[in-house]
Amino acid sequence: MAAMLGDAIMVAKGLAKLTQAAVETHLQNLGLGGELLLAARALQSTAVEQFSMVFGKVQGQDKHEDSYATENFEDLEAEVQFSTPQAAGTSLDFSAASSLDQSLSPSHSQGPAPAYASSGPFREAGLPGQATSPMGRVNGRLFVDHRDLFLANGIQRRSFHQDQSSVGGLTAEDIEKARQAKARPESKPHKQMLSERARERKVPVTRIGRLANFGGLAVGLGIGALAEVAKKSLRSENSTGKKAVLDSSPFLSEANAERIVSTLCKVRGAALKLGQMLSIQDDAFINPHLAKIFERVRQSADFMPLKQMTKTLNSDLGPHWRDKLEYFEERPFAAASIGQVHLARMKGGREVAMKIQYPGVAQSINSDVNNLMAVLNMSNMLPEGLFPEHLIDVLRRELTLECDYQREAAYAKKFRELLKDHPFFYVPEIVDELCSPHVLTTELISGFPLDQAEGLSQEVRNEICYNILVLCLRELFEFHVMQTDPNWSNFFYDPQQHKVALLDFGATREYDRSFTDLYIQVIRAAADQDREAVLKKSIEMKFLTGYEVKAMEDAHLDAILILGEAFASEEPFDFGTQSTTEKIHNLIPVMLKHRLIPPPEETYSLHRKMGGSFLICSKLKARFPCKAMFEEAYSNYCRMKSGLQ
C-alpha cells in the first residue's frame, strides 16, 4: 500500500510540474504575465504542499520506498527541464548544422542509426553511427537515464531505429516551427523498417518440408473455397464494373488470400518471388483485393530466427565474421523473397547493409515453382495460358541467377561505374570483405521506396519518373545490360540529397546487339504509329510467325502501338490518366488463346521492366513529354551503330 502511494506521489508531482509548464506557456502565449503568472505558480506550490501533508504519514512509515520514489522523481525532474518561455536561451536551433557539443555523448549511442549512411552521397551531419534530428541539435535532455543498468555494466543495448535527438524547453513558437518542419518532406529523415506484420519463422530447408507447406495450402484453399461458395458471397465485378483477369475464381476469398500470403511468406524463395511479380501489376490485370494482399508479400517476407541466420553467416563468412564489425543488428530491417537485410557497423565506423540469403532457397527453385503453379492451377486462380511452360522455364533460369550474390555484386559494381557521374542516380558501394555466394554487403543508404513518394510535389515526381524512363532506354540501347526487376523498393529516393539509389541487381541481364537492333526499330515504328512497320519487325523478331489469325495479329499490333503512345506525341503524356494497362488488359485473352509461338525469351524480363517503369509513372501520376527522350536514344543508337561498322 505504501509503495502504491509513493508511486502516486511521484505521479502527482509530475503532473503538477507538467501543469505548471503548460499554464505558463499558455499565459505567455496569450500575453498574460506578471501577477497571473505568479498566481499560477503559487497555486501549483500550494497544491504540492497540501498533497504532501495528506500523505506525510505514509511517507514516514516507509522511508525506503519514499526516498526511492523521491530520488527517481528528482532524477526525472532534473532531466526533463521544463524551462519557462521567459527563461534565457530556451529557443530551439532548427539548423541541421547545430554544434555537436549539444548532442548526446557517444557513450550513449546504442548501435548504428539505420536511417542514414555514414558515407557516400547520403551522409548526414552528426557523429558516426548517430541519427541527425530533422530539427537539428537542441538544448536540454528528455528522459535520458545516465544510470542505465545496461550501460553501467558495460553492455551496449540495441535500440532499433531510435531517435537520439534531445529536446529542451519549448515555446509555442518552437512547437509551430517543429510542426512546419515535420510537414516538409525535404526536412524529414527517412528510415527503412521491417513490416510490422513480418514474423520470425524458420525457413523450411528440405524439399519435403517445403512440399508439406504447399500441401497444407492446397487443403486450406479447398476448404476456404467451399466455405465461400456456401456463403454465396463471391463478387466477380469490381466497383467500376470492370472484370479483372484474376477475379473469376471461387478460391479467391479473403481467407484464402491470407492463406496464400502466409504460406509464401513462410517458404519464401521462388514461390514468394512469383507472388511479388503479381503484386506490381495494375488493378486491371489482378483482383484489387488480391493485389493489396500481395502488396504485403512485396513489402516484407517473414524473417529467419537468430540461430538459423547465424548458422548461414558462419557457413559463408567463417566463424569469425563478427571480428570485422563493431556492431551487428540481429533483427533485420528488410526481408524479401530470397534474403533478409541487417544493419551493421564496421570497425572504422562505416555503416553497411548485409543481405543474407535464406538457406535452401537456391536448391528448391524448380520444386517451389512447380508446387506453387500446381496449387494455383488446381484452384483456377490464373487464366489458362497466363504462365505457359516457356515462361515458367525462363523464370526458373532467372531465379537461379538471382540466387548468386557474387554475380549480383559484379553487376552492382558495373552499374556503379556506368552511373558514377550521373547527377540523379546512385549505386551503393559493394563491401567485398563481407560478400560471399550467399551474403551481399553494401554501404547503407537512406531514403524511402517510390511507392511512398506519392506525397512529393508534382515537379519532383515528374523528375523521378522522367529519369527512370531515360535510364530504361539507356540500359537497353546504350549499356546493353538492364536491371530487369521494377519492384518499387529497388528505387530509394532521398529527399535531402535529391537522389535515387538503385538497389538489387540480381535480376540483371545483358542484351545482344542483334536483339536491340530489331527491337529499337519496333519502338521506332510504334512511336510513328506505323502499323505495317510494326508487323514487319514483329515477324523478324519472331513475335509472330505471319500465320496468326487476324484477331491475334490485330491484338499484338494494338498492344505494341498502345505502348508506343507515350513516345508518339510531343505534348506532355499524362501517366496518371492514361488507360494503357486497361487497353492491354482487354487484349490479353485474345493473345493467350491464339498465340502460335512464345515471344523471344529476352522480352519477358524486358517487358517486365518497361511495364513496371510505366506503372511507377502511373502510380506517381507523372506528366511530361516522352517523344524527345526516345528520339535522343534512337539518334544515339544509330550513331553508335554506324561508328561500329
Curated annotation (Swiss-Prot):
A single MF term (Gene Ontology): kinase activity
Organism: Mus musculus
Enzyme kind, highest EC tier: transferase
Low complexity bias (residue ranges): 99-110
Binding positions (ATP): 337, 355, 442-445, 490, 504
Region annotation (Disordered) ranges: 99-134, 179-200
Pathway per the UniProt entry: Cofactor biosynthesis; ubiquinone biosynthesis
Coiled coil (UniProt feature): none
Subunit text: Homodimer; homodimerizes via its transmembrane region. Interacts with the multi-subunit COQ enzyme complex, composed of at least COQ3, COQ4, COQ5, COQ6, COQ7 and COQ9.
Enzyme nomenclature, EC number: 2.7.-.-
Keyword hit for ATP-binding: yes
Domains (record comment): Adopts an atypical protein kinase-like fold: while it adopts a core fold similar to that of well-characterized protein kinase-like domains, a number of features are positioned to inhibit the kinase activity: (1) an atypical AAAS motif in an alanine-rich (A-rich) loop that replaces the canonical glycine-rich (G-rich) nucleotide-binding loop and limits ATP binding by establishing an unusual selectivity for ADP and (2) an N-terminal domain, containing the KxGQ motif, that completely occludes the typical substrate binding pocket.
Residue interval(s) of motif AAAS motif: 334-337
One cellular component term from this protein's GO annotations in UniProt: mitochondrion
UniProt family annotation: Belongs to the protein kinase superfamily. ADCK protein kinase family.
Protein kinase domain sequence ranges: 326-515
Motif (KxGQ motif): 273-276
Activity control note: Autoinhibited by the N-terminal domain, containing the KxGQ motif, that completely occludes the typical substrate binding pocket. Nucleotide-binding relieves inhibition.
Annotated compartments: Mitochondrion membrane
SUPFAM superfamilies listed in its UniProt record: Protein kinase-like (PK-like)
Protein name: Atypical kinase COQ8A, mitochondrial
Pfam families hit by this protein: ABC1 (PF03109)
Transmembrane parts of this sequence: 211-227
Tissue expression pattern: Present in various tissues (at protein level).
CDD domains with a match to the protein in the record: ABC1_ADCK3
